[in-house]
Amino acid sequence: MSNIHPTAIVDSSASIHESVVIGPYSVIGPEVNIAADCELRSHVIINGPSNIGTGNKFFSFCVVGEDTPDLKYQGEKTTLEVGKNNTFREFCKVHRGTGADLGYTKIGDNNLIMPGVMIAHDCVLGNNNILVDNSGLAGHVKLGDHVTLGGYTLIHQFCQLGSYSFTGLGAQITMDVPAFTRVAGNPTKQAGLNSIGLERKDFSKGEISNLKKAYKIFFREGLKVNDALGKIRSECEQNDSVQVFIQSIENS
């Protein structure tokens, strides 16, 4: 208990690993489970039911695991599930799920959630994503892995962003974004393959070239969806990355 500041408030039903550090004026509500090696700076609020994995860091004035303001929510028991080694910077907000959909909000591992980011009810985030300052995810949004949201990106309900996709500053996402692609501008439009991001993630030149070919077939040749996917299957090397690209479109 020596790692809990005397001004912090921890509900008696919360389960806190002995290695967790809880800073001044933080509040941990009922049915919150926090695993080892987490750190809460000052004025952090975590409500439950919430399960927080190992090695997460919460900076000042985060509000995590709170009831959603969605009007469908009628006080039913829902949860927040957080994986390991995520960073939640100042003033970000994460709401639990609703009974009308998943019943939970889920965040994977190694995500960087920057100041002012809003993650609404029933969202699902994969791993290694970067959500830049003041991005907003409406309810039911899904992100794959290694997604980067530019600052002030707004994502409409039920949209899906595939792995390794990238959004420009102030993008307004109202449709799904396929894996490996970039969107930018206002109104927001496709802006090409996320080539620089793929290079930084150590994709080979051959993989990137193959994805560019698939991208051009789908977005530049004016084909119907099924025809474009058929042409990608017949003319592009069917490696893992192309399969992910195809699946992100088929699951849209």
Label the model's feature ranges.
Residues 3-189:
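Structural signal for interior beta-strand "rungs" in well-ordered beta-sheet cores
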